[in-house]
Amino acid sequence: MTNRLETKYENLSSIFRLKGHDYQKQFFHLYAHRLAEMTRLLTPLAQKKWGNKEPIKKLCELRGEQDVHCILIGTIFKHQAHKPSILRDISEENQLAPQPPRQNYSDPEDKIVLEDELQRVRLQGKLNGQLLATGVVCAALGGTDSDGFFNVEDILFYESGPQKPLAPIKRSRLLVLASGLDQLQAHKFVEALNLFQYWLAGSLGNNKEAGSMVRLIVAGNSVRASAMAHVPTLQVARTQANANDTVQAVSQLDQWFASWARSLPVDIMPGPYDPANFMLPQQPFHKCMFPQAAQLATFQAVTNPYSCRLDEALVVGTSGQNVSDLLRSTSLDSALEALRCTLTWGHVAPTAPDTLACYPYIESDPFILRECPHVYYAGNCESFATELHEGSEGKRTRLVCVPSFSKTQSVAVVDLDTLDCRMVNFSVDAE
């Protein structure tokens, strides 16, 4: 039996647990709270960067004025001609030309607008609109012109909140990050899953390394990792077969989770294709789905996004929806770059609720990064990628794009003391 290191654990995801289910509210409240809180956080940062001589003005104060040099704080909105529209759904009915489907709807002609509680102004100047997203709150330094534009000279983002320092290194504590188990297709890589299980238990490779593993987080798409094929209504038999396959996949997952949880604590997040609520934040799986694993104190189903503290290290992550949505609406090159941007912007899911579905909160925006994480990850990425991001005031964050296990047979391992990160591959074909 492998002796395991123990860590102090704290679940910080209560802000993502829904206390009600009122979906009739408007999203205005969410945007309003986001802007109000981010304005409060950005104001001292803007004054520190640009000095107190630059006034911070509301957009309504610029009405009719020219050559006003100031700081504006507001929410970015992108006018995108290729953004998905309800018109596509009704085009056939009204005999309109349908919009062509696009994997990415960013375009050099996108128009960037900054809006606050009352007004909006078109931005131009020193900003790359293709790398910005609707919903991002920023401070912009610049001036107005005779055409009604605000010419941006510099731009400032929140860069997430303060960061608590890590204690001096004692001994490596390893956090294992996995995603995309796709149990419906597990017959294609069951050997890799077995090797993964042996590795977690300390029966494969370095037993000392296994003893250093303090937690496993599975970041979504455990049941399936792709959209279910469309089934015509009349094909009831096929629909029932799909349901039976899902039940069997969940049962098999229960056995895997129970086995892993006997070796170390396991946290399971729902993903975009799992049998869970679609909107962010996704709520934890019900324990009845995994009756064997649920009997173990080391197993728990958690939210997506998920936040926890392991000793001093703050760990925050998602099952990847925030990153994939950003890649559709911007010209960002990679999942790692998109993940880095959300950290810089200080917001886990800035495109929610515009193009990323989320609950219509009316009292707060839970997706704001009020404290800078030490480990920040996104699940279900096409491949493994990582970077140690160094922010202002000495903040250091390990960014991790967790690879889909079904596609790569790989997981990510983060040392919580050094913030080093590496990939471990369990493919039987791996060298």
UniProtKB/Swiss-Prot annotation:
The lineage of its organism: Eukaryota, Metazoa, Ecdysozoa, Arthropoda, Hexapoda. InterPro entries: DNA_pol_a/d/e_bsu, DNA_pol_D_N, DNA_pol_delta/II_ssu, PolD2_C. Belongs to the DNA polymerase delta/II small subunit family. One of its GO terms (cellular component) is delta DNA polymerase complex. Component of both the DNA polymerase delta and DNA polymerase zeta complexes. The DNA polymerase delta complex consisting of three subunits: the catalytic subunit PolD1 and two accessory subunits PolD2/Pol31 and PolD3/Pol32. Within the delta complex, interacts with both PolD1 and PolD3, and is able to interact with PolD1 in the absence of PolD3. Component of the DNA polymerase zeta complex consisting of four subunits: the catalytic subunit PolZ1 and three accessory subunits PolZ2/Rev7, PolD2/Pol31 and PolD3/Pol32. The keyword Nucleus applies. It comes from Drosophila melanogaster (Fruit fly). GO terms for biological process: DNA strand elongation involved in DNA replication; mitotic DNA-templated DNA replication. Gene3D superfamilies: 2.40.50.430, 3.60.21.50. Accessory component of both the DNA polymerase delta complex and possibly the DNA polymerase zeta complex. As a component of the delta complex, participates in high fidelity genome replication, including lagging strand synthesis, DNA recombination and repair. Appears to promote the function of the DNA pol-delta complex accessory subunit PolD3 in both embryonic and postembryonic somatic cells. This is DNA polymerase delta subunit 2.
